Design a protein with these regions (language model features):
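Glycine-rich FAD pyrophosphate-binding loop
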Residues: 24-46
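A conserved beta-strand/loop capping segment in the N-terminal third of enzymes
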Residues: 53-104
Length: 385
């Protein structure tokens, strides 16, 4: 068997938003970058596909070709009832199909000079003092740095000894065909339902031709999720034939705990680093942000000839994990006491505007927690009425 050897500055394992963004940022600075994606591209990915405004602002290329629906409204219900509708009066985000969105980022990375290889399943990595070797069935890729952006069960974290104990949410989702009038009615509006999923929530995100309907549990078991999904669809009047529903499940590794995310010449980004937001499970923003931090650290390390990645973990913990710790506290309250929390948090103007500010990127979870704590007696009294 002939083993081909490829040499580069950086090998990125995984072609999702974290891997694609890191490859783009490094390639445009002149580094020699190879992306290894195990699936054939463009590949299907289970995800509600919500892009917040702050995520779009992090990416400096045009995404309009992959937008499905511009989001201007939000709706929250409790077990299908007690609706609270938000009219933002402006676009606060977009929905996308993940196969198209992820592929667009990889195409931008390729245009910037990265080599994108699909159908390349990484078997393992070997870290060395001055670099690393990434092995696939077809060959080995020698490089100065490896970025593990290969998701919740990534091989890079396992191979490098960076896979610590993590808490993960479990999500189940389907892309549901709906009549034109139903699609039209839901266009521009993201819908969240609380109380119908044990220790979690359900959602409906509009796309051009389908609705993304899903459920996620932050402390639950995957076994009950299918029943929760059908129950949610019934509650919301989304009729379907259960035998025709193709639901896909996935893990959402939650952030909010300081971790070591680098070792030698290897670092982790996105879901591989366990950086999803623990209140909603939002992962794309943190994937992109961690990838940009990774690219900065790697570029500096290679430019200075040190290969020292030690500032990466400290930066992620300070700039991302610290705030996710507050989201984790809010999630603990919201999902343990869903009915009270719905009235305390979702129906209160302070909770609404505070959460909107976090989504916009104007505020943080730390700020939101501080405001809610300061006004807790008044909000609680109002919620108990």
């Amino acid at each position: 068997v002939t083993v081909t050897t490829t040499r580069s500055d950086v090998v990125v394992v995984g072609g999702g938003p974290a891997g694609g963004t890191a490859a783009y940022e490094l390639a445009r600075r002149g580094l020699d970058v190879v992306v290894l994606e195990k699936e054939k591209l463009p590949r299907c990915k289970v995800c509600a596909g919500g892009l917040t405004l702050k995520t779009v602002q992090l990416l400096d290329f045009d995404l309009t070709s992959v937008y499905e629906s511009a989001i201007t409204r939000g709706k929250c219900t409790f077990k299908g009832r007690s609706p609270v509708v938000f009219d933002f009066g402006e676009v606060v985000g977009w929905t996308v199909m993940r196969d198209k969105f992820d592929y667009l980022i990889l195409q931008e990375a390729a245009t910037a000079g990265a080599q994108v290889l699909d159908g390349e399943k990484v078997r393992g990595i070997e870290s060395q003092s001055t670099g690393a070797i990434v092995r696939t069935p077809g060959g080995e890729f020698r490089c100065s740095v490896v970025i593990g952006a290969d998701g919740a069960n990534g091989v890079v974290a396992r191979s490098s000894g960076l896979r610590g104990q993590r808490r993960a949410a479990v999500a189940l989702e389907t892309e549901m065909e709906a009549p034109p009038d139903v699609l039209e009615a839901r266009l521009g509006c993201v819908h969240f339902d609380f109380g119908s999923v044990p220790r979690g929530y359900g959602w409906v995100f509009p796309k051009k031709e389908v609705l993304s309907v899903g459920v996620g549990s932050f402390w639950g078991r995957a076994t009950s999720l299918k029943a929760s999904l059908f129950s949610l669809m019934e509650l919301l009047g989304l009729r379907c034939d259960p035998s025709q529903v193709k639901a896909r499940g996935h893990l959402v590794p939650l952030g909010g705990v300081d971790r070591v995310l680098h070792k030698g010449r290897v670092l982790l980004a996105g879901d591989a680093a366990g950086l999803a937001e623990p209140l909603t499970g939002e992962g794309i923003y943190y994937a992109v942000r961690s990838a940009k931090i990774a690219a900065d650290v790697i570029y500096r390390a290679l430019r200075h000839g040190t290969g020292d990645l030690s500032s990466y973990s400290a930066q992620i913990n300070a700039e991302i994990t610290r705030d996710l710790r507050y989201a984790r506290r809010l999630a603990g309250l919201l999902y343990r006491l869903p009915r009270l929390s719905y009235r305390f948090f979702v129906t209160s103007p302070m909770g609404q505007s505070g959460m909107a500010d976090v989504i916009y990127g104007r505020s943080s979870f730390e700020q939101l927690c501080g405001d809610l704590l300061k006004n807790a007696p008044r909000l609680l009294l109002s919620a108990l009425r």
